[in-house]
C-alpha cells in the first residue's frame, strides 16, 4: 500500500528515508484515514505533521520550496472521517502567506517561521511575521510562532553548533517574546527541560494575566513601528484594551503612544500585566520607560 501511494519525488530534505504521499493515487485518502483512525482509537488529541507546511528540496532540487496542500487536505479529511476532534499542527515554516485561507480551512496551527531559537535576531524577525499573519488569527486557526526557547535548552542537541545551555535571551527579551506570542495568540509550546525549571522561568509560565491574552482577547494588530519602537494592541471581551510597547533599540528608552492613535477616547485606568500594579489613569497619552529589548504590557479599562 505505502509503495503504491508514495510520491517518489517528495523526499524529506533533512530525513531522506521519509516520503510524502501522492494525493492523486488511489488509496491515498484511505491510507491517511487508517492512520488517523488508529490515532483516534488511542485517544490522540493533537497531531503535528512535519515536512508539509513547506516542503524543501523536492525532486532532487535543494532550492525548491513547495506547499503540501494536497496532503494537508488528506489529513484534514481523515480527521473529519475519524469522528474525533483532533488538532492538526503543520510545520516547518515559514508558511506561505498566499496559502493562508487554505491553511485556515484545513489546519488548526501552522508554523510561520523557520526553527526559532534563543537569539534576539530570531525574535526581531517575528514582529514582521506576526504583523503579516495577524489578520488570519481566529478561533481554531492559529499561526504558530514556534516553540518558546526559555529555560534549560538542547540537553541532547547541537543546533547550529550550540549544545546544552540555559537560554541566551535576557530576561527582558524573554518577556518580550512571551508578550508578543500571547497578544498575537500564538500557540504556546515550551522548548525547555521541564524537570528543572527555575523560579524566573516559572514566573513567566504562570502569569495568568499575560496568559489570559490567548483566551480572552481578539483583533491583535500592530499599531505602529519605528526604528526603535513597536506597539501592538488587542481588545478584551468586555471592551478593555491590551497594549504592548516593545523597545527594539539597543538601549533603554521612554516611549509614548497617544490614545488617539489607539482609537480610544476619554480616561482609562492602566494596569501592568507583568507586575499586576495599577498605574493610575491616562486620557491622552500612554508613556512608559522600557528597558533594552524589553516590553511594557498593560491593560486599559475605561475609567
Residue map of PLM features:
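Active-site-adjacent "subsite" loops/lids of carbohydrate-active enzymes
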Residues: 1-42, 46
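Catalytic cores of secreted or luminal carbohydrate-active enzymes
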Residues: 176-224
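C-terminal beta-strand-rich structural cap/linker in extracellular carbohydrate-active enzymes
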Residues: 281-303
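Loop/turn elements at helix/coil->beta-strand transitions in domains of secreted/extracellular proteins
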Residues: 42-47, 82-87, 239-240
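Carbohydrate-binding surface patches
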Residues: 175, 181-184, 189-191, 225-264
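Solvent-exposed beta-hairpin/edge-strand motifs
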Residues: 260-276
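Conserved beta-strand positions
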Residues: 47-49, 54-57, 90, 245
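Glycan-recognition surfaces
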Residues: 4, 8, 24, 34, ...
